[in-house]
């Protein structure tokens, strides 16, 4: 009963705030939604404590959902170690975001609707991580996509919010369709979509092949690649990352919830959940490693030149997701989930601090129009500093324990893809430290560039916003140290059967014996980025400006500022051709052509022509009508007295045509 209550409490809170918000008021909506999410958090902590102490796993059968032929799908909830970790992360971050939003959105007239959306978002994420099969997971998958549309477009009178929400929806629909194809591939070959049955049958079908355009492809490779592309869209990996920075158009608590604990982490969760499949597909693991490392490097370079406060933090999310994915590609799924849980706390802290800064600065998000906030917002500055240091991987903070270990495992794999991931991830760590320090400089450490009246009215966060920041700061400092041995400690049996790693792919032991130089290199480069940015922006700012306006510097700056021209390529080369095909083929040839000719216009034209031909038979001569009656009588007699085989016998047809010509 406790497990079902945990799942449906956020849904009840969402319904109460959404349907009865007018009657219970703004405070009532805030209280109910925050309370239900908080209770879910408490219950998830109780459940994971029982799981750790007693090694329990739970499967709750609710009912049969779909039963059609060979397709049988039940509505079940699975509670294993992976699910419980995700539940703790989702519900704890969601509770703090709810509490923060109660004050941050206090002056918004639609607060009840906003709180309802947040709770619904949390509910669908819980459905996603507790699903016992791919179909139930897909319900939660689509639910978080739908809720992200509602939340990004919460201020629906703003054109940019409309465009950002539609963009997020469209990009995710593409990846969701490919994910669905992956699920259908699994069902077609295994005849089930339940996790346990599917994973148990993988060893049987792993050698199945099929021919596609003269290429021999493995069933497992195709299914894994399709599932990974679905995860790429949800977790904003390179090529499908376009929606992530635009999602900053929503309220800041939405950004914190999406980036820290819900939507973008769903792809990493799905990859870890399908680890028994991926372990039999070395090709897909290599692709995941390359895509993850490329994303980590790409996003860290783009973050160097951004000036929007929230977009800098958003690109850091994209970069950190790359680390999680290439950890999965290196078959170290527990390490990826470890980094996911660590990242959730310091990323939520960074976003909520950015919301406090934007709120204090009168909704200004351009960091060039800030400065000097360390004196005006001292508490927010300290919290943001803790989150930034944890993001950089500063020694003994939460981010350090997972981020550096991912890079060590990458080098210890002793493979081309592993070393590719190590070097790109290490360079990405340098850039991460650089743009984090740049953000600190412009927002907090430099002389202020804000208007005088804004500085006068700026104030630090109230208690309702300060409590979540303090708790997240605690997590950003200690969670990594506390949970490291449980997540990735040698000999830890915490994960049981929820994650499978092929013994030949496990590099955790090898990572312990790396040369010291390769272990320390990411930390050294992070410090170089930290002190390098500090030195350049404090003492050599003119040098940076001259470098930027130089011939090659300007080209490089534009390349990064335009996000490697991905938007330009997609809009001008892909979207334009697709739109032209949509107009010239789909609209003009099919919709207004084939369908119209076979449909309304064609039928109207045919019947008009037939009516005109029938009119010609009305000659007004009685002998014409008598002759037609005679022909009709002969025709009917022919039908009655002869077999149906002779229905169209040649004599009758010739006679009918001859008389018809005489009439004309």
UniProtKB/Swiss-Prot annotation:
| Listed EC numbers | 7.1.1.2
**Transmembrane region(s):** 2-22, 28-48, 77-97, 120-140, 168-188, 210-230, 250-270, 285-305, 321-341, 342-362, 376-396, 424-444, 462-482, 521-541, 590-610, 614-634, 639-659
Query: Which GO terms are recorded in the biological process aspect for this UniProt protein?
Result: ATP synthesis coupled electron transport; electron transport coupled proton transport
**Reaction catalysed by this chain?**
a ubiquinone + NADH + 5 H(+)(in) = a ubiquinol + NAD(+) + 4 H(+)(out)
Primary localization: mitochondrion
Q: Which InterPro entries does this entry report, sorted A to Z? A: NADH_DH_su5_C, NADHpl_OxRdtase_5_subgr, ND/Mrp_TM, NU5C-like, Proton_antipo_N
Which of UniProt's keywords are assigned here?
A: Electron transport, Membrane, Mitochondrion, Mitochondrion inner membrane, NAD, Respiratory chain, Translocase, Transmembrane, Transmembrane helix, Transport, Ubiquinone
Q: What single Pfam family name could you report for this chain, choosing any that match?
A: Proton_antipo_M
The membrane topology noted for this protein in its Swiss-Prot or TrEMBL record is: Multi-pass membrane protein
Top-level EC class as recorded in UniProt? translocase
Listed Gene3D superfamilies: 1.20.5.2700
Question: Which compartments does it reside in?
Answer: Mitochondrion inner membrane
Q: Mind naming one GO cellular-component term on file for this protein?
A: mitochondrial inner membrane
Molecular function as annotated in GO: NADH dehydrogenase (ubiquinone) activity
What does the function comment of this entry state?
Answer: Core subunit of the mitochondrial membrane respiratory chain NADH dehydrogenase (Complex I) that is believed to belong to the minimal assembly required for catalysis. Complex I functions in the transfer of electrons from NADH to the respiratory chain. The immediate electron acceptor for the enzyme is believed to be ubiquinone.
Q: Which PANTHER family match?
A: NADH-UBIQUINONE OXIDOREDUCTASE CHAIN 5
Family note: Belongs to the complex I subunit 5 family.
What name goes with this protein? Answer: NADH-ubiquinone oxidoreductase chain 5
Q: State the organism of origin.
A: Phytophthora infestans
